[in-house]
């Protein structure tokens, strides 16, 4: 299976990537800076690295069209301007629009546990991302 892995320098993706490769999947990882991603531990035949910034639509065409599944592990809490919720929504929208132009059938999104009454700014943002991603032409 051809898998797209976003948020590849994050904790969860770092744990997930070796498992995906060990299972025999072809994995394309999205990173903002290729220099920050160490590929030496992996078989180059099953791993490709592309530089993509989901806030910059001009970079999204680097994502291959022939992917079967994608992991959305992007999280923008580190914004120095404090507008991480808008950044997260824009990233999710750009991701969704690009995925709609691929053959992806399944997107896996890791959210947070939310209730409908009282949400922190962080969890409200995660819920908005889920709502944005759920509008895609794939299973979420």
Locations of the language-model features?
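SDR active-site strand-loop-helix element
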Residues: 6, 30, 73, 107-112
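NAD(P)H-binding glycine-rich loop region in Rossmannoid oxidoreductase-like domains
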Residues: 35-102, 114-116
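N-terminal Rossmann NAD(P)H-binding glycine-rich loop of SDR-like oxidoreductase domains
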Residues: 3-25
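Conserved beta-loop-beta element that borders a ligand/cofactor-binding pocket
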Residues: 111, 131-140
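Conserved catalytic-site region of short-chain dehydrogenase/reductase
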Residues: 113-124
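Conserved glycine-rich Rossmann-like NAD(P)H-binding loop of the short-chain dehydrogenase/reductase
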Residues: 25-32
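A short helix->loop->beta-strand "cap" motif at the edges of active sites that frequently abuts
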Residues: 101-106, 137-138
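Rossmann-fold NAD(P)-dependent oxidoreductase module
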Residues: 15-19, 98, 132
């Amino acid at each position: 299976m051809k898998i797209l892995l976003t948020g590849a320098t994050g904790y969860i993706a770092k744990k997930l990537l070796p498992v995906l490769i060990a299972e025999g999947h072809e994995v394309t990882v999205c990173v903002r800076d290729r220099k920050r991603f160490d590929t030496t531990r992996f078989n180059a035949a099953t791993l490709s690295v592309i530089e993509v910034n989901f806030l910059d639509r001009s970079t999204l065409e680097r994502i291959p069209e022939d992917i079967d599944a994608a992991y959305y592990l992007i999280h923008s809490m580190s914004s120095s301007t404090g507008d991480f919720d808008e950044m997260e929504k824009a990233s999710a929208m750009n991701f969704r629009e690009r995925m709609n132009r691929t053959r992806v059938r399944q997107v896996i999104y890791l959210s947070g546990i939310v209730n409908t009454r009282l949400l922190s700014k962080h969890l409200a943002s995660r819920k908005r991302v889920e709502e944005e991603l759920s509008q895609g032409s794939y299973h979420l």
